[in-house]
Amino acid sequence: MGQKINPTGFRLSVLKNWSSRWYANTKKFSVFLNEDINVRQYLQKRLAHASVGSIIIERPSRNAKITIHTSRPGVVIGKKGEDIEILRKNVEKLMNVPVHINIEEIRKPEIDAQLIAASITQQLEKRIMFRRAMKRAIQNAMRLGAQGIKIMSSGRLNGIEIARTEWYREGRVPLHTLRAEVDYGTSEAKTTYGVIGVKVWVFKGEQLSVRDRQN
C-alpha cells in the first residue's frame, strides 16, 4: 500500500497535518473547498518565481489565515511590504472574509521535496539534461542532511520518440513506515516535446507521532 499511495495522505494525523484546516457543515463545505482551490491556484501562479513550498489555509471564525512557506520571503513581501498587501487584498476578494497572510521561510530548500521537483522542472524547461538535473538535486539533498531521496521523471526525456520513466535514488526511503518523515512533491515541465512529470520523495528521519509530541 505504501508503494502506491500519496506519502502525505498516508501519514495524515500520524506525522503530517492537513493543508486546509477548518470545519464546515454540508452546505458550506463545497464553497470553502472551491475557495481554497482558487486561492491556491492564484498564489501559485502569482508567486511562481518565489519558490513556494506549501500553502496552509486556516479559517478561524469569520476570517482566514494563510501561511506561505517559501525559501524567498523577500520576493513575496516586496519592497516595504507592498507586494504582500496587494496579495492580501486580492485573496480577500476570492474568499470574501478578512485575510491575514503569514510568511514562513524554508531554511533548507535543498531538502524540500516540492522545491526540488520545481527546480528540476525549471531546468528541464531550459533544456538542461534530465540526468544532470536529477543527480545534482540528489547530491545537494544528501549534503544538507537528507537520509534518503528518490526522484522519478516521466515523459519524452531529452526529446526521444517513445516516452519512458527514469528513477534515481540514494540512501533509504521507507514508504511503509508511518513514523518515517517522508516529504513528497510533484511538478510538471512543459517542454516543446510535451509534458514531463517529476516526483520527489525525501526521507528526513524517523519522528514521534503528532499525538506523542503533543503529550
From Swiss-Prot:
One of its GO terms (molecular function) is structural constituent of ribosome. The keyword Ribosomal protein applies. InterPro entries: KH_dom, KH_dom-like_a/b, KH_dom_type_2, KH_sf_prok-type, Ribosomal_S3_C_sf, Ribosomal_uS3_bac-typ, Ribosomal_uS3_C, Ribosomal_uS3_CS. GO terms for cellular component: cytosolic small ribosomal subunit. Residues 39-107 form the KH type-2 domain. It comes from the Bacteria. Keywords: Ribonucleoprotein, Ribosomal protein, RNA-binding, rRNA-binding. NCBIfam families: rpsC_bact. Part of the 30S ribosomal subunit. Forms a tight complex with proteins S10 and S14. Belongs to the universal ribosomal protein uS3 family. Binds the lower part of the 30S subunit head. Binds mRNA in the 70S ribosome, positioning it for translation. This is Small ribosomal subunit protein uS3. It comes from Nitrosomonas eutropha (strain DSM 101675 / C91 / Nm57). The gene is rpsC.
